[in-house]
């Protein structure tokens, strides 16, 4: 082989090597990154298998949707359990990934999502559960319901399909969904998934309101009552103070010092009231029922009886002595209250009892008459 032929062979060898390198480079770069559609499909499969990030996103959106409906905030110690429930619920949405198209330097992928109708699947269970609710603690009550609700997820139907356009961008050798697309996707995976929480929270919110009414009336603890009624604590405090300076006090024509003695004695007597609200249930007609254990505070009743007996016997020679005798009697029972036998009162509250009006208020008044009979 002459020199010219040798140079030709070298050139052919170099071209061959270069071609091989180009083929290998093309194989490594062109086949190493999956198609945008495949990435979206894998992402959706991961969501169906239970994805922590999506469960957190769903939970936060759910908490925001119920924020302000109830006085109690969503409990921190319930979040982990609710995320697990959401991960299982995500196994029941369906999808179809369609075509992808380039969009600027990113991609758009069309996807049809049929959400899992969680609310429908657990609706009957929710209703039955709150009719027999035994717990008075929000986290415990919801956790029990979630365990039952997970069994119902197998009956979950799918809602109407919705076509979404998801935007994805390149990230290293793969892709990632944009934040907006993640949020849009989260909004369409499940429906009614906060229903178990709301079913329980609604009932316990009514119970909590009843507790706040009693505590504000008898104990002077007004902060929770103010939150339930939308008033300020100052307004609630003023209402409490006025309850001890009504027509009865004005009719007695007391001095400033005597008024103070009367109000202090009455506040102590009221504060000594004993009541305990049991579990609350929701009735089939949409009302609420609970059992309240009451140990009647007989102090006012005994004070009136003692005053009447003393007056009838001629113990008081003047109106001033009568007033002083009454104040002294109240102060005695304020320091040493007298109680009757404990009893259980069944209390029925109508729908909308959160405003405590009409029949609902009559029920509460009946309860109050047994807590502190006059």
What residue spans do the PLM features occupy?
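Bacterial N-terminal signal peptides that target proteins for export
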Residues: 3-17
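Sec-dependent N-terminal signal peptides
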Residues: 16-24
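C-terminal motif of bacterial Sec signal peptides marking the signal peptidase cleavage site
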Residues: 27-30
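Core segments of small alpha/beta cavity-forming domains
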Residues: 32-88, 92, 189-268, 276
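Primarily extracytoplasmic ectodomains and periplasmic/lumenal surface modules that are beta-strand-rich
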Residues: 53-54, 116-118, 219-224, 297, ...
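Surface-exposed, charged secondary-structure patches
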Residues: 76-143, 257-324
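Beta-strand-rich interaction surfaces with strong enrichment in secreted/lumenal proteins
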Residues: 97-98, 152-155, 278-279, 333-335
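Short beta-strand edge/turn micro-motifs at domain boundaries
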Residues: 108, 127-201, 313-321, 335-374
């Amino acid at each position: 082989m002459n020199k010219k032929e040798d140079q030709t062979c070298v050139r052919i060898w170099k071209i061959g090597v270069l071609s091989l390198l180009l083929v290998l480079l093309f194989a490594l770069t062109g086949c190493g990154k999956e198609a945008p559609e495949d990435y979206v499909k894998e992402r959706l499969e991961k969501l169906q298998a239970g994805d922590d990030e999506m469960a957190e996103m769903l939970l936060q959106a759910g908490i925001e949707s119920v924020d302000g409906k109830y006085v109690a905030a969503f409990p921190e110690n319930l979040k982990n359990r609710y995320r697990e429930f959401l991960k299982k619920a995500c196994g029941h949405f369906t999808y179809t990934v369609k075509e992808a198209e380039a969009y600027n330097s990113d991609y758009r992928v069309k996807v049809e999502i049929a959400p899992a109708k969680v609310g429908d699947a657990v609706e009957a269970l929710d209703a039955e559960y709150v009719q027999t609710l035994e717990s008075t603690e929000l986290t415990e009550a919801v956790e029990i319901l979630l365990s039952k609700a997970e069994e119902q997820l197998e009956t979950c139907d799918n809602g109407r399909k919705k076509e979404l356009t998801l935007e994805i961008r390149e990230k290293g050798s793969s892709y990632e969904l944009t934040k907006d697309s993640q949020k849009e996707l989260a909004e369409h995976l499940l429906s009614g998934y906060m229903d178990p929480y709301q079913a329980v929270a609604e009932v316990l919110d009514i119970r909590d309101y009843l507790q706040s009414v009693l505590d504000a009336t008898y104990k002077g603890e007004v902060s929770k009552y103010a939150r339930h009624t939308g008033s300020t604590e100052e307004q609630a405090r003023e209402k409490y103070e006025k309850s001890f300076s009504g027509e009865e006090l004005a009719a007695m024509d007391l001095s400033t010092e005597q008024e103070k003695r009367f109000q202090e004695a009455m506040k102590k007597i009221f504060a000594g009231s004993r009541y305990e609200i049991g579990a609350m249930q929701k009735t089939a007609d949409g009302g609420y029922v609970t059992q309240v254990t009451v140990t009647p505070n007989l102090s006012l009743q005994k004070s009136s009886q003692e005053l009447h007996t003393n007056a009838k016997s001629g113990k008081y020679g003047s109106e001033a002595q009568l007033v002083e005798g009454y104040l002294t009697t109240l102060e005695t029972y304020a320091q040493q209250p007298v109680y009757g036998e404990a009893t259980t009162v069944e209390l029925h509250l109508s729908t909308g009892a959160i405003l405590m009006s009409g029949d609902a208020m009559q029920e509460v008044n009946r309860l109050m008459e047994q807590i502190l009979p006059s």
